[in-house]
C-alpha cells in the first residue's frame, strides 16, 4: 500500500533520490538553467517536501514552496526509477494540489524544461489542468524554460 508522508530529509533513500534528481536536472538542462533545489534548500522553512512510499521502498517525492500567502510553487517532483509508470507522480501532484488548496493558495505554479527528457512531466502537468504562462518567482525566461500555472480559486 502506498502512503504519502511529510519527509524530514534524513533518510538514505530520499537523499539518493534527490541526488539523482539534481544530477539529471543538470544533465538535461543547459548550463545555468537547472533550478532543482538541493537538499539544503529543501530544508528551508518556506518549503515542505513529501515522500511517497510503497511499503519500505521510496517511490517518489514532491515539494511545495510558498512564494506568497496565496501562491505556491511545485519543486522536486521525482519518481524513483523502479516506480515509473505506476501512478506515483499522479498521486504526488494530486497531494500537492490538495495541500495548496488547504493552505489557501489561489495559484500553483512550476518551472520545467522543454527538451524530450521533460515530456512526461509536461504531459502530467497538462493532464492536471496546468496551463503554460508567464515567468514568475524571479526565473529568467529562455528558450528552454517553460512556466505553468493552475488557478485554485
Question: Whereabouts are the PLM-identified features?
Answer:
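Acetyl-CoA-dependent GNAT
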Residues: 2-75, 80, 93-94, 99, ...
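Generic structural signal for conserved hydrophobic packing positions in ordered secondary structure
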Residues: 18, 74, 108-110, 118, ...
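Short hydrophobic/aromatic beta-strand or adjacent loop that forms the aromatic wall/cage
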Residues: 47, 143-148
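Short coil/turn segments at alpha/beta junctions that flank glycine-rich nucleotide-binding fingerprints
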Residues: 70, 86, 103-106
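Conserved acetyl-CoA-binding loop-helix of GNAT-fold acetyltransferases
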Residues: 79, 85-98, 123-127
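Conserved GNAT acetyl-CoA-binding A-motif
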Residues: 100-113
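Conserved beta-strand-loop-alpha-helix junction that forms the acyl-donor binding cleft
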Residues: 110-121, 139-143
Amino acid at each position: 500500500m502506498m502512503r504519502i508522508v511529510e519527509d524530514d530529509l534524513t533518510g538514505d533513500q530520499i537523499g539518493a533520490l534527490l541526488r539523482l534528481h539534481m544530477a539529471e536536472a543538470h544533465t538535461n538542462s543547459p548550463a545555468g538553467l537547472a533550478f532543482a533545489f538541493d537538499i539544503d534548500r529543501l530544508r528551508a522553512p518556506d518549503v515542505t517536501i513529501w515522500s511517497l512510499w510503497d511499503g519500505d521502498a521510496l517511490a517518489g517525492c514532491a515539494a511545495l514552496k510558498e512564494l506568497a500567502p496565496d501562491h505556491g510553487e511545485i519543486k522536486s517532483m521525482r519518481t524513483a526509477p523502479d516506480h515509473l509508470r505506476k501512478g506515483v507522480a499522479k498521486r504526488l501532484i494530486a497531494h500537492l494540489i490538495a495541500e495548496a488548496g488547504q493552505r489557501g493558495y489561489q495559484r500553483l505554479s512550476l518551472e520545467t524544461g522543454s527538451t524530450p527528457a521533460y515530456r512526461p512531466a509536461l504531459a502530467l502537468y497538462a493532464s492536471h489542468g496546468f496551463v503554460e504562462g508567464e515567468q514568475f518567482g524571479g526565473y529568467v525566461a529562455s528558450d528552454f524554460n517553460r512556466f505553468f500555472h493552475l488557478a485554485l480559486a
